[in-house]
């Protein structure tokens, strides 16, 4: 029997989801993330907004803003570039695509802990396994040169786009806007 001032903490039951449920939720989170954060391609490829920056300082500010605003588009462009460079080696393409999918589903877009055979798998074990698997895959595919060329090409394309894309007509997120007010300012 408890005294009137005492309380007992009842542990909440942990929700254990199967590996299939975790992956299904991860796929759902991935699709929701890509569809909600990606600016439309018509905005990305707006030819009326392309001009040369006047100096180095505006170019740097354009790069910062465009990299932030078009981040998902640049990731998709990088994936397309890597795919084009690896298309000549289907085994390498399938291997890289499967490891990218594993990283996305098992690490980046997973909300709940992964449970295998009734045991929780920690994030450290998942990251360690994904890193080892990715390094093994890069060694196994023997197409590291094509992969590096794809990444370098996409980085150059993204950088050129970020420099020449005028960022004046981009929509500003409300949370990023700070409106200065002199309401409580005493001079």
From Swiss-Prot:
Which regions span the lipid bilayer?
84-104, 125-145, 146-166
Q: Which residues form the signal peptide?
A: none
Pfam families, sorted: PRA1
Record keywords, A-Z: Endosome, Membrane, Transmembrane, Transmembrane helix, Transport
Q: Which domain of life is it from?
A: Eukaryota
Offer one example of a GO biological process linked to this entry: vesicle-mediated transport
Q: Where in the cell is it found?
A: Endosome membrane
Q: In which tissues is it expressed?
A: Expressed in roots and lateral roots.
| Topology versus the membrane | Multi-pass membrane protein
One GO cellular component term of this record is: endosome membrane
Family statement drawn from the similarity comment of this UniProt entry: Belongs to the PRA1 family.
What is the purpose of this protein?
May be involved in both secretory and endocytic intracellular trafficking in the endosomal/prevacuolar compartments.
Give the protein name, as stated in the record: PRA1 family protein G1
